[in-house]
Amino acid sequence: MDISNEAGVDAFSIIGPTTIIGRTIAVRILFCNSVSIFRHKVFRILKFFLRGGRVLLSPFVSLLHPRNPQGILVMVTTMAFLLNRYTSLKAKAEMAYRRKFWRNMMRAALTYEEWSHAAKMLDKETPKVNETDLFDVELVSNKLDELKHRRHEGSLRDIIFCMRADLVRNLGNMCNPELHKGRLHVPRLIKEYIDEVSTQLRMVCDMDTEELSLEEKLSFMHETRHAYGRTALLLSGGASLGAFHLGVVKTLVEHKLLPRIIAGSSVGSVMCAVVGTRSWPELQSFFEGSWHALQFFDQMGGIFTTVKRVMTQGAVHEIRHLQWKLRNLTNNLTFQEAYDITGRILGITVCSLRKHEPPRCLNYLTSPHVVIWSAVTASCAFPGLFEAQELMAKDRTGEIVPYHPPFNLDPEEGSASVRRWRDGSLEMDLPMIQLKELFNVNHFIVSQANPHIAPFLRMKEFVRACGGRFAAKLAQLAEMEVKHRCNQVLELGLPLREVASLFAQEWEGDVTIVMPATFSQYLKIIQNPSNVEIQKAANQGRRCTWEKLAVIKANFGIELALDECVTVLNHMRRLKRSAERAAAFSAISSSPPSKHLLAGTNRFNASKRIPSWNCIARQNSSGSVDDDVLAEASRLYQHIVVGSGRNSNRTSNLSHTYDAGSECDSPEAEDWTRSGGPLMRTNSAQMFTDYVQNLDAVDPEQIRASENDSIVAASSSSHSITVTEGDYLQTGRTHNGFVLNLVRGENLRMNSEPEDSQNESEIPETPESVQLDSPEKDIIDGESSASEDGDAQANLIHDHE
């Protein structure tokens, strides 16, 4: 058979099982077969479950039958519950969104009005907390009712007894920070209690009654203030992050909540120096624009200059630029001079380079002669950033000399090493213990901007806000554990002692304002911040302080009322003594001229005294007390004097005991600050001061009754001195007595008339600087010797033996 004509099969060879097309077709057929088998299996499984589900759902389906009312009721109730749940969740979500919106508005606010509006709206959106869990409502309410009852009865003695018996700062835990957190205002009950106590204190201060004398009122206020305690503002370190303190202090100044005791270290000491050397009007004007120019770091220069400075001085920056800036800010004032001018207590912490010397808190009691700019420079000398500094002070002549000069009697041994000081935040960032011991401080407001502390405190606040009280307790436990381990390192003397000392200190106070620093701010921590960066940090400080105003007012309100009452009473006492002195002088002047011989010695005029080297007239010591308060006190006293016919009893007690932090409201306080320097610290000088003080307590009637005997005694004495009218006597000390140096009135008036004419009513009495004025001449018993010129100087030596 011929097969040559059969069809060819070469064209079908491309779809064979070994080709790509053939394999693709085979895979497709197999895949479709597998899907079909899987579909049948799934169908069988679903059919099985549907059969079982029908059996299970048949009772529930029967409940939905129209003839079954129970089933319909269950269905409707379930649907209503689900709808209500959905609605409540939606309302909560909307409320949370609104709270987040107002919080963002608070974080972006630039003025207190904007912030307070956002805080008020946030308070409305926030669920109310149960205040009974945070403080003793019953105790505070009962105490408030008792105070109101005693005030309505009108017994001043009962009011004083009640407040002296039980007036504490944290009554019933009403100063709990958790209670005031996120609040715009103080809780109503606590505000009523603070207002009631303040009202009764002012009522005691202003009431004119014979039941209570002015001296008794002042003693009551001083004792109550000492028992109540003081508030101090502490500013931490933080290099350029210290611009945060600007906003904190500015907010406290604007709301008149700035404490009179302020202390700090490192960059915080710079802000303390600004506050402690300016009067209240100067401080208010400082924050209006001049604070933008705070640039304390010099230009680092090139890499070779920086390396050379590090190799020679051990520091990156040159400290002379910082010293020059601080001199301009503080005007070469010492701690004592700043205290005399402003009435504020300034504290600056420094650490010694010596291993066994403890850190110090410099203030007007521990180091009155140290120059403030020197202390601030030493407190800013962080190792590696600035070199350690030597403290400078003023000597008796006013020259700036080393505070701890090397002393060695044997020249062969060589001079001792210089005592240098560095950053106080290394060992004592917040000098709480020292302030408690020296100034009776029991409440601290802390502004924390340290880069190694602030992040942990912010984290702890976040944990407390998100995790509740239990999480807050765990965070507190972790903090205590870290401090405990660091203290163990310090006690055992292990390596890294300096690092351990940074974390072993106290970080927080009763009210802690923590800086929310950003990462970009940490990168520029040792550089001069620009004006924009200073403004940003200051705004952060203001917003963080606005959040704490409620708790600060709760802690600080009664203390402010006590300070105001003490200031007003001291002002009234000065007016009273001035009026008594004027009345006594008027009575003496009305007597015959021949009887002025001894009476002239009874006038003790301290307003024209010759200030000693360490005594500056305080013209701005009223602090944050408004001028209208003092004016009201003056009007009140004038009303008292006119109504009583100027027949009030004279007071001869010129030495009262005050607490250590009294701001020297009474100029008669017998301490170093009012003693006129070393020459007036002897027993002889004290006897002479007591003698002159007793002269002021003599009544005109007693003077007239004893004039004849006194004139005879004066004429029979062989030791006398004649002083021309208008001249003044300055006290001095010798080896066996004291010396009175005569100063011509013409020279003194040329130097003192402009200042005295402006501040004569504000300068308090100081019995340490003595002036004896006489219409004709002054006579004092003792030995006298004339000067070589005969009219330039007169010396009187009196033997106390």
Swiss-Prot record:
Compartments where found: Lipid droplet; Membrane
Region annotation Disordered: where it falls in the sequence: 648-675, 750-801
Listed GO biological process terms: lipid catabolic process
Task of the protein: May be involved in the release of fatty acids from the oil body in germinating seedlings. Can hydrolyze triacylglycerols in vitro.
UniProt cross-references to InterPro entries, sorted A to Z: Acyl_Trfase/lysoPLipase (IPR016035), NTE (IPR050301), PNPLA_dom (IPR002641), Triacylglycerol_lipase_N (IPR021771)
Positions of glycan attachment: N130, N328, N332, N605, N620, N649, N653, N708, N759
Keywords: Glycoprotein, Hydrolase, Lipid degradation, Lipid droplet, Lipid metabolism, Membrane, Transmembrane, Transmembrane helix
Catalytic activity: a triacylglycerol + H2O = a diacylglycerol + a fatty acid + H(+)
Coiled coil (residue ranges): none
Membrane topology: Multi-pass membrane protein
Gene3D superfamilies documented for this protein: Cytosolic phospholipase A2 catalytic domain
Protein name, entry field: Triacylglycerol lipase SDP1L
PANTHER family assigned to the protein according to its UniProt record, in alphabetical order: NEUROPATHY TARGET ESTERASE/SWISS CHEESE D.MELANOGASTER, TRIACYLGLYCEROL LIPASE SDP1L
Main localization of the protein described in the UniProt heading: other
EC number(s) recorded for this UniProt protein: 3.1.1.3
Catalytic machinery residues: S266, D423
GO (cellular component) term, any one: membrane
UniProt keyword annotation of Glycoprotein present: yes
Domain of life where this protein originates: Eukaryota
GO molecular function list: triacylglycerol lipase activity
Acidic residues: compositionally biased ranges: 753-765
Annotated source species: Arabidopsis thaliana
Enzyme class: hydrolase
Ranges of residues in domain PNPLA: 233-436
Expression across tissues: Highly expressed in mature pollen.
Transmembrane segments: 232-249, 261-277
